[in-house]
Amino acid sequence: MKIFEFSPKIGIREIDHIRHRIDLGNDTFATGKISYEKVDELCRVLREFVDIMRGYKVEDFKAYGTSAIRETENTMIVLDQIRQRTGIRIEVLSNSEQRFLDYKSIALKGQDFNKIIEKGTAIVDIGGGSIQVSLFDKDTLVATQNLRLGVLRLQELLNKLNAKPSKYEGLLEEIIESQLSVFKRMYLKDRTIDNIIIVDDYVSALIQKRLTGSQTPGYVDSASYEMFMQIMRTHTKEEIAARFGISTESIPLIFISAVLILSLIHISE
C-alpha cells in the first residue's frame, strides 16, 4: 500500500509505503482456489491497512487484484469476503489492464524511458501466474506475448516434480527456454535486444539497491548480472539474505525470477 499527498504546491508526493507479502498464487495455481486461511490472513492485513489509512485521514483509495484473484475459481466468494470483512472493494484487473498500468508507471518513473526504447527493448512483467514480454523497436511497440511462466506457477511445478534444490536451475532453464525459444522464432527473428526492463516484486528491488558490479542503482549490465547469479548459486540462503538485506523466505521466489531474467538475457544475445 502506498499513501500519497496531493497538493497544488508540490503536486503528488509519496508519504508512506507499507508492504506485506501473501503468496495467494500458491493456492490458485496448486488447487484452483484461494484457501480460507489465506483469505483470513488477507482480510486481517487489509483491516490493518484500513486503520493506517484512517490515521493518515485518507480521502479516497483504489485496491486492485491481479492474476492470483483473477484466475481462482472462487473469485466472487473471495471478493465478497473482503468487502464484508474490510469494507474494501477490490477491482480485478484484466491482463491487458494490468500491463497498461505497468507501462504507464515505467514511462512516468523512468526519465530515460523514451531514449531507451529507441533501441531494441524488451519490457518483461514477471507476475505470479505469467510473464508478459513486450518488444519495442524505434520507439514503437512491435510485439507483446503472455507466457505462463509466472514465479509462483513455476514454484508449484518444481514442488510437483519433487526435485532437489541443486537441480532447480537446470529444470527451470528447460521449462523456461522451451517457451522462450518459440517466442524468439516468432517475434525476435533478426531483431536485436539492447535493453531489458524488468517489472517484478523480486529481483527489481535488488537492482534498485545496486547489484554487485553495477555502477548505477536501477541498472545492471549482463556481466554484473552473471556475478549476481553466481552469488545466488554458491551461497546459502542466510548468506544471501544478509548480503542483500532480504528475508530468507523470499529467496526461493527471487531465485526463480532471477533464472527467468537470465534466460531472457541469453535469448536476446
Give the ranges of each region predicted by the language model:
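N-terminal basic/disordered segments at the start of proteins
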Residues: K2-R13
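Helical "lid/coupling" subdomains associated with nucleotide-phosphate turnover
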Residues: I3, D23, D27-Y56, A68-V78, ...
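Post-signal peptide N-terminal segment of secreted/secretory-pathway proteins
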Residues: D60-F61
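Short glycine-aspartate micro-motif
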Residues: T121-D125
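Active-site-adjacent helix-turn-beta-strand microarchitecture at beta-sheet edges
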Residues: G127-S130
